[in-house]
C-alpha cells in the first residue's frame, strides 16, 4: 500500500511539473499509471479473468 502511495505522489509531481499541452498529456499518463497501480493490487484476480488478462497483458507477463 505504501508503494501505491509513492507511485501516486510521483505521478502527481510529474503532472504538476509540466505545462501547456504537455501537462494534458502528462495527466493522461498519470491517470493510466494510477489505473495500473490499482490493477496491480488485483493482479491474481485479473490474470485469472480472460477479459482482464487480454485488456492488461502487461500485468500477467503478456505482450504489450
UniProtKB/Swiss-Prot annotation:
**Which is a Pfam family this sequence falls into?**
Toxin_8
**Chain intervals for the UniProt region annotation (Ser-Xaa-Pro motif, crucial for potent interaction with nAChR):** 48-50
The UniProt GO MF terms for this protein read: acetylcholine receptor inhibitor activity; ion channel regulator activity; toxin activity
PTM Glycine amide: at which residues?
Answer: 61
Q: Which residues form the propeptide?
A: 18-43
Keywords in alphabetical order? Acetylcholine receptor inhibiting toxin, Amidation, Disulfide bond, Ion channel impairing toxin, Neurotoxin, Postsynaptic neurotoxin, Secreted, Signal, Toxin
Q: Which domain of life is it from?
A: Eukaryota
InterPro entries according to UniProt? Conotoxin_a-typ (IPR009958), Conotoxin_a-typ_CS (IPR018072)
- Tissue specificity of this protein: Expressed by the venom duct.
Q: Name one GO cellular component term.
A: extracellular region
Q: Where does the record place it?
A: Secreted
Which pairs are disulfide-linked? 46-52, 47-60
Query: In the record, which residues are listed under signal peptide?
Result: 1-17
Q: What does the UniProt record say this protein does?
A: Alpha-conotoxins act on postsynaptic membranes, they bind to the nicotinic acetylcholine receptors (nAChR) and thus inhibit them.
The miscellaneous comment for this protein is:
Negative results: does not inhibit high voltage-activated (HVA) calcium channel currents in rat DRG neurons (at 1 uM toxin).
Q: What is known of its domains?
A: The cysteine framework is I (CC-C-C). Alpha4/7 pattern.
Q: Which family does it belong to?
A: Belongs to the conotoxin A superfamily.
- What protein name is recorded for this chain? Alpha-conotoxin-like Ai1.2
